[in-house]
Amino acid sequence: MSLANHTFSNPSRVLQRNESLFTNKNILVAGNIDDEYPLQLQALANSSTFCFSDYRYYSVLKDKLTTSEVHFTDNYQGETKFDLLLIFLPKAKQETLYLLANLTPHLQPGASIILVGEKKCGIKSADSLLASYSNRINMIDSARHCSILHAELNQPVNAFTQSQWIKTYPLNINNTELQICSLPGVFSYGELDKGSELLLQNLPDKMSGRVLDFGCGAGVIACYVLKKHPQLSVDLVDINAFALASAKLSLQSNQLEGNVFPSNVFSDIKEKYNILLSNPPFHSGKNTDYTAAETFINQSTNHLKSKGKLSIVANRFLNYEGLLFKAFSNVKIDQESNKFKVLSCITKT
């Protein structure tokens, strides 16, 4: 992924109008970071620490933020006390609350808390998210359908305990019982989505070899196939730090073993697999984006062994069959519901 021609997002452009907020400050930055504006923040601040939850932007920016501390993390645990926290507002309210709970203990009393985001992400009502941290909350700018909220940290802050944020739910599909754990910021937080459920109900009875769970989320697919087929070797990948942490928790909760690591589609994958499984992501932050799913399909044959199989679930309106027919044989629809379809195919060689 290259950001060479990547323009600043609207939230970043609004921040550009207010850069005096960051001048000579010791800043902690997190949330929906999706452009190169961190480079400007680094230049403005006295010191800067960035907590990325999206592996794509972490991978591109980690070596450019040469004077900053840079983390890809679901749970920041540094020792520094900052005088400003900037959160690029995520789409999910629970993720914002989680970030505030995790990061405010690392602030000095009286520090600034700044939320920036678009109206469609809920910035207009985000002052309620800050109420337990401050009684001095102001909207200091609004433009490009975005706003900046500023709060002074003047309320007591509790120590952060990640376990309080984990939602665990039971799962029973085809007489296979599981406990799934998920953190805020993960797709279908705290419940099984209907697409993944349809995929699990229609996987083959026999599986062997090495399996990849692409876009693993909370690890539902991997946990299911490992419980059904303990002999499998399973890798789980995602770009989301909260998803990867959740997948590890789900594996542990079910006494299962899998290899969990970040990868932007196949960027960090060197193996070839017998089976690729996925409920492919089609959101990037707050926007609909099919790039990752299409890249996964287009490059999947490079990571499958001879006669390797791919099984995915997708919204019915998406024409993934057209992409699959280019590289696979025996492309078929295994099952359909009113919203989803399960597709499977085999490599041509």
From Swiss-Prot:
One cellular component (GO) term of this entry: cytoplasm
Catalytic activity: guanosine(1207) in 16S rRNA + S-adenosyl-L-methionine = N(2)-methylguanosine(1207) in 16S rRNA + S-adenosyl-L-homocysteine + H(+)
One Pfam family hit: MTS
EC number: 2.1.1.172
Record key words, sorted: Cytoplasm, Methyltransferase, rRNA processing, S-adenosyl-L-methionine, Transferase
Family in the record: Belongs to the methyltransferase superfamily. RsmC family.
Name of the molecule in the record: Ribosomal RNA small subunit methyltransferase C
Gene3D superfamilies given in the database record: Vaccinia Virus protein VP39
Assembly and interaction partners: Monomer.
